[in-house]
C-alpha cells in the first residue's frame, strides 16, 4: 500500500528505452509532465529504535513545507510491503520505501538547497536521527495511465517485476508499445504501467530495470 502526496505516483518509473506514455486525458499527473523521462529518488528506510511512523511522518510534513517554500516540491509516494519475497533466511531489511519524483534540474536544485540552506541542513539532521535511509536515483517514465482512476484516491497497490533485457533497444521498445496498445484496449483493472531504470546508487539492483503495474484494489490485481 502507498501513502501519496500530492496523490499519485507509485509507478513513477522509467525507461530510457520506453515507448511514449498513453494517458487518458493529457500528459500531466498531479501537475507533473510524465510523457517524458523524469527523475525518481528512492529512499529505502528503516526506522531507528523507538521511532514511530507518526514521528517520522511529522518530519516528512515539515519537509513538504520546506519544499514548497523553495518551489522544489516532488510527487511523493510511500510503499509498504504486502506480498514480499522475505522469509526466515531472507528478511526484508526496510520498514518502507519512499519515492520522490521530479524533473531532473529541479531535483538537483532541491538537493543543493537541502545540503546548503540552514533549514535544509536542519531537516536533514532530523531525518537521519529518525531513520536509516539508503538513497538511490532512477529514471522514470509512465507508459500507461488512467489519470482519473489514479488521482481519485491516495492508496494503490503496485506490483514490481525486475527485468534484464535479452534483446536490443528497438525490440524492447516495440514490445512495450504492443503491450501499451493491449492495455489501452482492455485494461482489465490495470490503471497504470511504468518503468524504472536505476542510474545512481543501485549497482546491486535485482535487474536492469523494473516494470511497475498499478491497481486500485487487490481484486483487480488478482483478476490479472
Pin down the residues of each PLM region:
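Short S/T/G/P-rich N-terminal loop/turn motif that feeds into the first structured element of a domain
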Residues: 13, 23-224
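Bacterial N-terminal signal peptides
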Residues: 10-18
Amino acid at each position: 500500500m502507498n501513502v501519496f502526496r500530492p496523490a499519485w505516483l507509485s509507478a513513477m518509473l522509467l525507461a530510457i528505452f520506453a515507448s511514449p506514455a498513453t494517458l487518458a486525458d493529457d500528459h500531466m499527473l498531479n501537475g507533473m509532465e510524465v510523457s517524458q523521462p523524469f527523475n525518481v529518488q528512492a529512499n529505502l528506510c528503516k526506522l531507528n529504535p523507538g521511532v514511530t511512523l507518526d514521528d517520522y511522518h511529522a518530519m516528512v510534513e515539515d519537509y513538504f513545507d520546506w519544499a514548497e517554500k523553495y518551489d522544489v516540491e516532488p510527487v511523493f509516494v510511500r510503499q509498504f510491503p504486502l506480498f514480499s519475497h522475505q522469509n526466515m533466511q531472507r528478511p526484508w531489511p526496510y520498514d518502507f520505501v519512499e519515492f520522490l519524483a521530479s524533473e531532473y534540474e529541479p531535483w538537483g536544485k532541491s538537493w543543493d538547497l537541502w545540503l546548503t540552506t540552514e533549514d535544509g541542513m536542519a531537516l536533514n539532521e532530523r531525518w537521519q536521527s529518525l531513520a536509516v535511509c539508503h538513497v538511490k536515483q532512477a529514471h522514470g517514465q509512465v507508459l500507461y495511465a488512467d489519470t482519473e482512476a489514479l488521482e481519485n484516491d491516495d492508496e494503490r497497490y503496485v506490483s514490481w517485476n525486475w527485468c534484464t533485457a535479452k534483446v536490443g533497444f528497438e525490440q524492447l521498445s516495440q514490445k512495450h508499445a504492443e503491450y501499451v496498445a493491449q492495455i489501452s484496449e482492455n485494461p482489465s483493472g490495470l490503471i497504470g504501467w511504468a518503468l524504472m531504470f536505476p542510474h545512481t546508487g543501485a549497482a546491486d539492483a535485482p535487474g536492469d530495470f523494473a516494470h511497475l503495474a498499478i491497481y486500485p484494489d487487490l481484486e483487480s490485481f488478482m483478476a490479472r
